[in-house]
Design a protein with these regions (language model features):
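Helix-loop-helix hairpin linking two adjacent transmembrane segments in secondary transporters
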Residues: 154-206
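A late C-terminal transmembrane helix in Major Facilitator Superfamily
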Residues: 361-396
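Extracytoplasmic
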Residues: 24-59, 77-80, 166, 263-268
């Protein structure tokens, strides 16, 4: 059902909400995302050490539980995307937000490691309905022609989650311990985020049609888009997920994600091992976050001047080159900080490239389904990233070899995504073929 002021196209694709309503949705999701990311993700980076010190569980085991959550996140996200396509984000984000509250309750009260790990697996399922992918699906559907601006705003605010919640979590842990901290953060989710999802997302939703013709306004060939034939066959989203371009895009972006986050997670220990002080290493990582914000601020202009595959190749190339430079650069603060900012810039752009990868190639139809499948391998890669980075350093004799190997992964990922552009014959070519 659609409201009178929301245009619904005959093919089941929403033309977007009125701008006032869209601004309300962006504000709702921005507040929910900064809180959900802070509680479900960044709080763990602060509390991992205190948890190990209090319980005696090893850092590796605790990190493995958290990585397991990311794997469950990726697997559950496929179902979440399909549900959002059909019913909208309100119900699923509210229910999964409540699941997050319950999961953190299990984590906070666990007396055995296996109960703790089970709590994180539940939290991983909750992440699938609470973090960026469902929010991206909502704004892609409701944003209409303003969706890139809406997505940019969301990621700018969401990017502040670590800035807000890392020091907050540290203070809470020092005052009351990690268990009470998680219980308090769970209460924040319950009292703040759940109402935002339930009341702030109560907007009309046009269910995605199961099958329809490709969108004639779609940039599927990294260039001018031909009109499809009027009698062109309809397509199914799952046909797209089995296509060569989709598979290559999923594989290539998972390699880029693995390289990017293995570098970020291990940046501070690598810089300290190279001879820099922990303070300088922390500044380098923090200013990389500034670069990330700058990349997101400039994304709309960058996207307007590039093609979908072209910008992904540029970001992948920049990531690989900066990683090589970081591997061989002398441990000079100014040099390291400059490279960290460049890598942050690439990460900021990459987040929005991931958010728009489906719409840039296949349109807004079935965005939730396609995005859920596309991002699942990247989520698994991100979960493995900390272990992959550390393992490479151990096998290759240090962080220089590890960073060069990660640069190689980024380069391979870039080559793969360069071959991922979808194509289809133009209507003119089809008509010429028919006449001949």
């Amino acid at each position: 059902m659609t409201a009178p002021d929301q245009v619904a196209r005959p093919d089941g694709v929403s033309a977007g909400l009125p701008r006032r309503d869209l601004r309300q949705v962006v504000a709702t999701l921005s507040a929910a995302q900064i809180t959900s990311w802070g509680v479900l993700y960044y709080a763990f980076t602060v509390l991992q050490g205190p948890i190990s010190a209090d319980t005696g569980w090893s850092h590796v085991a605790i990190a493995a539980a958290f990585s397991g959550a990311q794997v469950v996140n990726g697997a559950t996200g496929i179902w979440v995307g399909r549900h959002i396509d059909d019913y909208g984000p309100r119900r699923v984000m509210t229910i999964f937000g409540l699941l997050a509250v319950a999961a953190l309750g299990v984590v906070a009260t666990a007396e055995s490691f296996w109960v703790f790990a089970a709590g994180w697996l539940l939290a991983g399922a909750a992440m699938a309905g609470s973090l960026y992918p469902p929010a991206f699906a909502a704004l892609t559907h409701w944003g209409g022609p303003d969706r890139v601006r809406a997505l940019t705003t969301l990621t700018l605010v969401g990017g502040l989650a670590s800035t807000v919640f890392a020091p907050l979590t540290t203070s809470l842990d020092q005052a009351m311990g990690w268990r009470s901290t998680y219980l308090l953060l769970a209460a924040v989710l319950l009292l703040a985020v759940t109402p935002l999802h339930w009341w702030g997302l109560a907007k009309p939703w046009t269910p995605s049609a199961r099958h329809r013709q490709p969108d004639p306004a779609l940039d599927v060939q990294d260039g001018p888009v031909p009109e499809p034939d009027a009698d062109a066959p309809a397509w199914d989203p799952w046909t797209v997920t089995r296509s060569r371009p989709f598979v290559l895009l999923a594989f290539g972006t998972s390699l880029l994600t693995l390289a990017t986050y293995a570098l970020v997670v291990n940046l501070i220990p690598a810089l300290v091992d190279a001879g820099l002080s922990p303070g300088v290493a922390a500044v380098a990582l923090g200013l990389g976050g500034v670069g990330q914000v700058a990349g997101r601020l400039g994304y709309a202009r960058f996207a307007a001047a590039t093609t979908p595959t072209g910008r992904l190749v540029m970001v992948g190339t920049a990531t690989a080159a900066a990683t090589v430079a970081l591997a061989v650069a002398p441990p000079v603060a100014a040099v390291v900080i400059g490279l960290s900012v460049l890598l942050g810039l690439a990460r900021g752009v990459y987040t929005l490239i991931q958010a728009t990868a489906v719409t840039d190639r296949w349109g807004t139809h079935a965005y939730g389904r396609l995005s859920g499948v596309l991002t699942a391998p990247s989520l698994v890669a991100g979960a493995a990233a900390p272990f992959v980075g550390a393992a490479l350093a151990a096998v290759l004799g240090g962080w220089t070899g590890a960073f060069l190997a990660l640069a190689g992964l980024a380069a391979v990922g870039t080559l793969v995504v360069a071959c991922s552009s979808p194509t289809r014959p133009s209507a003119r070519a089809a008509r010429s073929s028919a006449r001949s």
